[in-house]
From Swiss-Prot:
Protein name per the record: LL-diaminopimelate aminotransferase
Cofactor: pyridoxal 5'-phosphate
Reactions performed catalytically: (2S,6S)-2,6-diaminopimelate + 2-oxoglutarate = (S)-2,3,4,5-tetrahydrodipicolinate + L-glutamate + H2O + H(+)
Disulphide-bridged cysteine pairs: none
UniProt EC number: 2.6.1.83
Subunit structure: Homodimer.
UniProt-listed Pfam families: Aminotran_1_2
Biological process annotations from GO: lysine biosynthetic process via diaminopimelate, diaminopimelate-aminotransferase pathway
Residues binding pyridoxal 5'-phosphate, per UniProt: 71, 104-105, 128, 174, 205, 233-235, 244, 275
Database matches in PANTHER family: AMINOTRANSFERASE (PTHR43144)
Protein species of origin: Chlamydia felis (strain Fe/C-56)
Protein purpose: Involved in the synthesis of meso-diaminopimelate (m-DAP or DL-DAP), required for both lysine and peptidoglycan biosynthesis. Catalyzes the direct conversion of tetrahydrodipicolinate to LL-diaminopimelate.
Amino acid sequence: MRRNSNFSSLETNYLFSSIRQKIRSFREKHPEISIIDLSIGDTTQPLHASVIDTFSTSVRKLGNPKTYRGYGPELGLPALKEKLSEVCYRGKVSPEEIFISDGAKTDIFRLFSLFGPGKTIAVQDPSYPAYIDAAILAGARKIVKLPCTKETDFFPVIPQEENIDIFCLCSPNNPTGTVLNREQLKELIDYANSHGSIILFDAAYSAFISDPSLPTSIFEIPEARFCAIEINSFSKSLGFAGVRLGWNIVPKDLKYSDGSLIIRDWERFLCTTFNGASLPVQEAAIAGASLFPNLEAISKYRYNSSLLREALQKAEFVVHGGEHAPYLWVEVPSMIPDEDFFDFFLYQYHIAITPGKGFGSCGTGYVRFSSLGKSENIVAACQRLSQTSVYDRTVLSL
């Protein structure tokens, strides 16, 4: 059996394994020092009581012959789809256009696979690494990286010379923590519609948006129905990171160049490759969706972000994003070499962060802070940051 050649095309990224190794090494050498890990985007707030109650009730039903159920509908429970249509989209998206899944990451790969190999796929730079890996494994012909820098307000520079099949856009963005406004989204939508491109819009962090002038869905721009697919997740909003549940939207107006409906192929694809998400999890999500948009966990993460922003600015760092996302994109002074960013924060502040270059070349000069940590850890990190300016000293070892 020959190896799938797409695996040979994957970029080798040692950064994240190196981070884990450096943290282990530091703890072995300095067990008396506590490290606050703000490098990962994992959630820490517990599930809401109403979600737990519904979840347990649903699971108990599986233990009773009278209430036991086997397979559910492959495309998702109608009640959950109706709830999402109502509370998240105010009827702008019909329940039939919503597909329940086991999470955003698998949706990304499935959608790339739906459109088949040989496509040119554009991703933001910096961006979530899974987009590129999934595109390569699905047989993408070419990956085009769209620079997102502070000079462009982290808006992707659209290539005029490339014929893009699929745009991968994430807003609120991981890692920059910034949000595309309506005018910016409209510009990208107009481009996609005029060039026959598809926008794969990752809205996994939309629950963090508190400004009503900012779009929480690409379908707030009507023309998006002709060029976009949206992905979302319950991981951050309801704390389902370990439970696994998400959804995607494929509009009925979205068509291939020959006029056939993409939604029909998507339904066939899912019925062939996916047996549907867990029924107890979906029922728990119905209870959780009833809490939208007043989510206590999101409020706590937002507060964490505000504390981190204030502390980082007090330490004289330049901070971007974080107002409507759980990530802060922090500039590091040029006096500290890029390859030393992680060690600098580890040894000077005893805080673990993610160097920006792990998200692409345009991440050079930045680090990402996550506000998804426990409140007490965020407070402790802020105390450490506030006590020492980045310009006071530079410590790279102990």
